[in-house]
Amino acid sequence: MSKKLIGNKSKNFKNKLGLILCVLFFLPSQIFAIENKILLKVNNQIITTIDVNKEIKYIGLINEEFKNFEKDKKYTIAKNSIIKEIIKEIELKKFYKKIDLNDEFINKFAINYFSKFNINSLKDLEILLKKNGLESKDLRKKISIQLMWNELILKKF
């Protein structure tokens, strides 16, 4: 009798396992993926929902009050921020061959700027960025564009 009981438990377990695997297999893959749609195209540069979500994280990192805004307002601000950055980049390319600054200069600027978060080294900055789902290459690009834009404006006016 005990063999029959063990056999039934084993059969029930296999049935449950099979059911779970079928459910997981047939679930739409979209449930597990972040949706990425093209939102805009600015001078042949595409802005996607992932770009906007990264920008929301970035703005939230540098502006504590931004975190309290409603989701729609955050989305609009982030989208407009990306558009402005692309326009700046397009204009900068008219005056500069390359939009990139010296690594040492960018590193010092970033550490100084993020010192309000107790950032004293590049390692600390990397940790802060990773913690917020951001990448240093994106920050580097943002800093380069903004500082070169400021320089261009000062030269023009």
Predicted features along the sequence, with ranges:
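Short, low-structural-confidence N-terminal segments
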Residues: 1-80, 127, 131, 154
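Peptidyl-prolyl cis-trans isomerase
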Residues: 70-157
